[in-house]
A protein has these predicted regions:
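ABC ATPase NBD Q-loop/coupling interface
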Residues: 1-15
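Conserved switch/coupling elements of ABC/ABC-like ATPase nucleotide-binding domains
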Residues: 7, 28, 149, 153-164
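Conserved ABC ATPase "signature" region
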Residues: 52-70, 95
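Conserved ABC ATPase signature
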Residues: 74-78, 82
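Hydrophobic anchor residue at the start of the ABC signature
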Residues: 88-89, 116
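Catalytic Walker B motif of ABC-type/P-loop ATPase nucleotide-binding domains
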Residues: 99-103
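ABC ATPase nucleotide-binding domains
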Residues: 167, 173-200
């Protein structure tokens, strides 16, 4: 695996952490403050302590995610959406070129799902980042992602743009009968109801 032309397997853990940031599916339920959690994103760069540059990067990450007013609050007192934004800020503080996100919307309500993915997309466009997201909600994926990799039984089934989604893909990968429709210029997946066995 190469990032910016460099073989990640040839790099130390510290150097990998400077290039790749990970946002987990479940946010830790801890009494750590928002500021301290975001500061953890600077660990790959720290030697003898926290520098002025570290403070600046953390401040900018929290400002970007609108977290400045909650810098002193504990994570276990925040909503699921707020926690996920904190983890995005921590990832941003790493100054990576690649963001890895594992089901970042799985435990969020619809409003926070859209907010988190919108922020992630904006981050990629404004900070020139690449994001790889594991996500099972196809409609969210079609709305916010540019390229798609479909897996079937551990093997690559298809890779490409939104055009890779069709009735065959829905059947082969997800085991459902459905189709892709356009609504106000947006691709949506419609799943047909399974036919119930007739009772004789």
């Amino acid at each position: 695996c190469r990032v910016d032309g460099e073989d990640l397997l040839a790099l130390s853990h510290r150097e990998i952490a400077k290039r790749v940031a990970f946002v987990a599916q479940h946010v830790p339920d801890t009494q750590m403050t928002v500021h301290d959690m975001v500061m953890l994103g600077r660990r790959p760069y720290m030697t003898w302590g926290v520098t002025e540059h570290d403070h600046h990067v953390v401040h900018e990450a929290m400002r970007y995610l609108n977290l400045e007013d909650m810098r002193g609050r504990f994570l276990n007192r925040l909503s699921g959406g707020e926690r996920q934004k904190v983890m995005l800020a921590r990832a941003l503080a790493q100054e990576p070129t690649l963001l890895l996100l594992d089901e970042p919307t799985s435990s969020l309500d619809i409003r926070n799902q859209y907010q988190v993915l919108q922020i992630t997309r904006d981050l990629c466009r404004e900070q020139d980042l690449t994001a790889m997201i594991v996500i099972h909600d196809l409609n969210l994926a079609l709305r916010f992602c540019d390229r798609f990799l479909l897996l079937r039984e551990g093997e690559v089934y298809r890779y490409g743009g939104a055009e890779i989604f069709d009735a065959d893909a829905l059947r082969d990968v997800y085991g459902v009968k459905g189709s892709i429709v356009q609504v106000q210029g947006q691709s949506l997946v419609l799943i047909e109801d399974e036919e119930k066995e007739k009772i004789s």
